[in-house]
Amino acid sequence: MKNEAATELMMHLQQLDPEISRILWANFDHRNPSPLSKAIQDARGISRQAASQILSRLVRQGLITEGAGVRPKTYEQQTLFTHSVTLPLDGLEEHVVWSEHFRPAFSQYMGEAALSIWEYGFTEILNNAREHSQGTEVKISSNIRAGCTSVWMDDNGEGIFKRISRICKLPDERQAILELAKGKLTTDPENHSGEGVFFSARAFDMFQITSGGLLFDHQDGEEDFLFERDKEKAGTLVWMAHGNHTQRTLKEVFDEYSMPDEYTFSKTVVPVKLARFGQEGLVSRSQAQRLLARVDRFKIVLFDFSDVETVGQAFADEIFRVYAKGHPEVELQPIHATPQIQQMITRATAMT
């Protein structure tokens, strides 16, 4: 009976309209039940009654369950598939783990674009744990719902931020997150390009790295965030989540950071706020130099000033006059700058 129920559930999921799957993911709250009727009405241009009929059918099929909310009515996505495995890192082959333990189920629950992103990101992050963590084992867990899939990879190694700080001789583990956000960072330049974590973070809808007392959070279309945690996390935990019927392709992710007619990683976005440690303001040349480390590896660098209200004159001058003059081959562009910040940049460039 259990196998029959699983087969029936699989059939319902395979027949699920991709648009409904995307609505479930876009309106899904990992912690609380979510109202869905209005989202379906707006997406489909249908009445509340018609949206309720769709939701009632999804409940009967076992794809979602009703939450406690009444006005508006709320729903939760059912977990349809889970799998967890703990493996030794020594001798591990990431493509074998993917193809034997996870791809068979993933391929039944999602579209080709999502599957391609999972194959890339899963194997890149697992390879990173195998070759760089200095750990002995990794635990991999997956959770598939009607709208989305999540994977956790938890190794018992040194910790990614601690390792980067040690090998790259950085003064603070928080700067390791800033360097990861730029891309082209590797602790083994002879064998790795430093692109795997960067592109994995941008391929998935949601991506988090937790290690030590820090958490790095990247969400598609949102700003990068750095959270400081009270509780230390040994090793490195990477969480990835992605819509089962995403319309974004892996090629589009790569193209966003490449020059036209080129196939190289030549463009990056630097979240300026990650150069700010604690409550400090961004006023000094040394803080600007945190941002500028290694940006000469790119042709175009976008400095994203989201969540930064103001900067000091020395900070702006170091980036947009001093560095720009010394590196004319690198195009520096500010984005999301406030009028005050733009004024500081204009003042700096006027002095060149």
Residue ranges of model-derived segments:
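Bergerat-fold GHKL ATPase/HATPase_c domain
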Residues: 2-123, 132-135, 146, 165, ...
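Conserved beta-strand-loop-beta-strand hairpin that lines the nucleotide-binding pocket
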Residues: 29, 65-85, 129-251, 322-324
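A short acidic, amphipathic alpha-helical/loop segment
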Residues: 199, 290, 318-319
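A structural signal for short secondary-structure junctions
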Residues: 232-234, 294-297
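Short, glycine-/small-residue-enriched flexible loop/hinge segments at domain edges that mediate gating
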Residues: 298-311
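Short, non-transmembrane amphipathic alpha-helical segments
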Residues: 315-326
